[in-house]
Amino acid sequence: MSKSTTVLITGANKGIGLGMAKAYLSRPNHIVICSVRSAKTDVTDLEAASKASGSKLLLVYIESTSKTDPAKAVEDVQAAGVDHLDVLIANAGGMPEGNKPLLELGPDELCWSVQVNAAAPLLVLQAFKPLLQKADAPRFAVISSTSGSIEHMKNIHSFIFPGYGAAKATLNWLTMGVHLSQEWLTTLVIHPGLVQSEPGNWVAKQIGMAEAPTTIEQAAEGVIKALTNATRESVGGKFLSTSDGTVLPW
């Protein structure tokens, strides 16, 4: 009997998170753990996803501003029989409401964005570390954005999304720190492209596009392809654009 590959995806009820969940569930022998905000979150599409032989879906609840949800999620998956975690994809995130200009951005909006986009992924990693350490080749990826690239700011004018961009830059810093300090773990930062999700299409319109160029299915497959055989030597510590395979500047 084949050993199951266990994957955790945060923010998996919509957008690229849902796309990745569906793609993993369509592969045989995958336990796909999907985190959503709460029991009130609509998970109809997740539960309806086709499942290959030996694959199954587990739901856990992680609200990105909660300090205790990640630890409770670990307890829940262990109670369901999960004894290791092969892949952790920190996908959940968000943009501050209103997207205020840089010189109008208040501390509350900035702190909220850093909590949701940077601190929350770190808390999830901290909680699931023991299960990752039981995997043969554990991998940790964060879904970031070119908005978090300081070098790219002058080219793409990402300062028009100050709360989001600053938080993603913080996420990038933390993830590089994980790569350098945790030599047992393959860690990378992923930019999946400008994706046809609700926030992706909103961003596209802000820069004069009718819609984002990358479909959810393309983005999901790009991330999964990058992670399937990822090693520290091949992608560890890199800021990888999975839509075209390029390595992005920090």
From Swiss-Prot:
Pathway involvement of the protein, from the record: Polyketide biosynthesis
Protein's UniProt keywords contain Acyltransferase: no
Chain positions recorded as NADP(+) binding sites: 16, 35, 63, 91, 164, 168, 195, 197
Disulfide bonds: none
Name of the protein: Short-chain dehydrogenase RED3
Signal peptide as annotated in the record: none
E.C. designation(s): 1.1.1.-
Function: Short-chain dehydrogenase; part of the gene cluster that mediates the biosynthesis of pyriculol and pyriculariol, two heptaketides that induce lesion formation upon application on rice leaves but are dispensable for pathogenicity. The highly reducing polyketide synthase synthesizes the heptaketide backbone of pyriculol and pyriculariol. Pyriculol and pyriculariol contain several hydroxyl moieties and double bonds, so it can be assumed that several reduction steps occur during biosynthesis.
Key words, A-Z: NADP, Oxidoreductase
GO molecular function, one term: oxidoreductase activity
Assigned protein family: Belongs to the short-chain dehydrogenases/reductases (SDR) family.
Entry-linked InterPro entries: Fungal_SecMetab_SDRs, NAD(P)-bd_dom_sf, SDR_fam
Residue positions of the active site: 145 (proton donor), 164 (proton donor), 168 (lowers pka of active site tyr)
Induction pattern: Expression is increased in rice-extract medium (REM) and is correlated with the production of pyriculol.
Cellular-component GO terms for this entry: cytoplasm
